[in-house]
């Protein structure tokens, strides 16, 4: 499927938020497509995130991928996959308030709903920090499904300065369906943390699918030594199955 790529600057209380838009090219008819709010890792719109966005758009989705650190960096800033970029991304993660993350999600959800190619049915997807933010986006009633890949800090951590402790506690408020995908060799979400997340979702009565690969953190990032192309292919297929079923 041919896609178009561009961006919009969405207004937020903390300034304009550059949001990258990928959508199927306009057909000759009046086709409309589901929308996806896509969250990146802590590095913003890197090459792997752009390619993931393009893949999803090519499967028939209007994808909006916001620059989550818009209040800290100018539009278009991409952090490097190195120690300096990692340190900066983690610092911004801690400095951004939970209210900002949640409000920004609502802004993108409204923009998706207003996009002329979107049919109004909206899901969320994210990797790493973005997996956590996709989970939180599902707390908003418009989000019908969320695919969360190796979501960090769900079990408690430094997101928003350590104020993320209510994410799992609010799982009962999620009325859509979740997909949670993990790597068993992920040091950021070890066995005990994954077990705690699973038990919390069961206790909350959440509708979810759970899949673990023998893979590292960031195994879907299609550059670098941790990339596992076969696991990434299967994981993306799980997400597409979720969205086809729910959106």
Predicted features along the sequence, with ranges:
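N-terminal cap/leader regions of alpha/beta-hydrolase-fold enzymes
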Residues: 1-247
């Amino acid at each position: 499927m041919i896609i178009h790529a561009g961006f919009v600057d969405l207004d937020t209380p903390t300034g304009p938020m550059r949001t990258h838009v990928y959508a199927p090219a306009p057909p000759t008819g009046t086709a409309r497509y589901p929308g996806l709010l896509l969250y990146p890792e802590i590095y913003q719109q890197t090459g792997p995130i752009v390619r993931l966005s393009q893949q999803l758009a090519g499967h028939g989705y209007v994808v909006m991928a916001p620059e989550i650190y818009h209040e800290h960096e100018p539009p278009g800033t991409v952090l490097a996959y190195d120690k300096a970029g990692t340190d900066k991304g983690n610092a911004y993660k801690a400095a951004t308030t939970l209210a900002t993350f949640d409000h920004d999600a609502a802004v993108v959800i409204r923009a998706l709903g207003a996009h002329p190619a979107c049919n109004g049915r909206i899901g969320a997807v994210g990797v790493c920090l973005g997996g956590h933010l996709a989970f939180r986006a599902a707390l908003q009633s418009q989000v019908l499904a969320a695919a969360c890949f190796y979501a960090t800090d769900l079990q408690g951590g430094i997101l928003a300065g350590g104020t993320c402790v209510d994410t799992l506690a609010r799982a009962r408020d999620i009325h859509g369906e979740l997909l949670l995908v993990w790597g068993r060799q992920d040091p950021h979400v070890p066995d005990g943390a994954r077990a705690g997340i699973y038990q919390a979702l069961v206790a909350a009565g959440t509708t979810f699918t759970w899949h673990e690969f023998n893979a590292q953190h960031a195994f879907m990032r299609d550059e670098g030594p941790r990339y596992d192309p076969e696991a990434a292919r299967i994981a993306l297929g799980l997400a597409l199955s979720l969205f086809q079923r729910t959106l």
